[in-house]
Amino acid sequence: MARRWSGETRLGLVRRARRMNRALAQAFPHVYCELDFTSPLELTVATILSAQSTDKRVNLTTPAVFARYRSALDYMQADRAELENFIRPTGFFRNKAASLIRLGQALVERFDGEVPSTMVDLFTLPGVGRKTANVILGNAFGIPGITVDTHFGRLVRRWRWTAEEDPVKVEHAVGELIERDQWTLLSHRVIFHGRRVCHARKPACGVCVLAKDCPSFGLGPTEPLLAAPLVQGPEAGHLLALAGL
């Protein structure tokens, strides 16, 4: 299959990437951030806690955290041992607790206790890197951003949108292919697809809506009936219906 794409032009790549995004929009019409939050501060905290953890584990942990710590000042003044105990289930709790306390301090001292809405300012916050900043901008403030997590990077390389490994380079490469107003939604769609269909070890190729545009089609079972059991998540019925099953 690799030879099929060896002569793809830049224009051809742009058209294919945008066509794949439209197909993903049909497959996942109601994408969203899978971290639970009600404010920019809650999303920032949840995203920091999600490092080396799962969204499911974070969502089980944050209700108690958000009830106890309601403001940046609360985090700044938190008893470290108590905070560590709250967030222990997410892993690396000592480092994360230190980051959250310093985050609260930075927000109180420099931003009047509010999470800023620019990449430049977000970058200055403890525990906030580019991926976290894009999550916050896109989901708390409606500012388009591409979130390059493990799933996103793996899939766009599998699709040959880019060969880059560095997340920042991946972000820029994909940003040149897809319309800016689609960046946040694209991020969710790709992550949903990676978690539900395009698995790392055994993708469900035979029921994938991207099959005709995917250079890696065939990495997983191509027979629909063999691929169908691999599809995960609450959208499984919809995805299988799109595949004619």
UniProtKB/Swiss-Prot annotation:
Its cofactor is [4Fe-4S] cluster. It catalyses: 2'-deoxyribonucleotide-(2'-deoxyribose 5'-phosphate)-2'-deoxyribonucleotide-DNA = a 3'-end 2'-deoxyribonucleotide-(2,3-dehydro-2,3-deoxyribose 5'-phosphate)-DNA + a 5'-end 5'-phospho-2'-deoxyribonucleoside-DNA + H(+). One of its GO terms (molecular function) is metal ion binding. Its EC number is 4.2.99.18. It comes from the Bacteria. It is an enzyme of class 4 (lyase). NCBIfam families: nth. Belongs to the Nth/MutY family. This is Endonuclease III. It comes from Mycobacterium leprae (strain TN). The gene is nth.
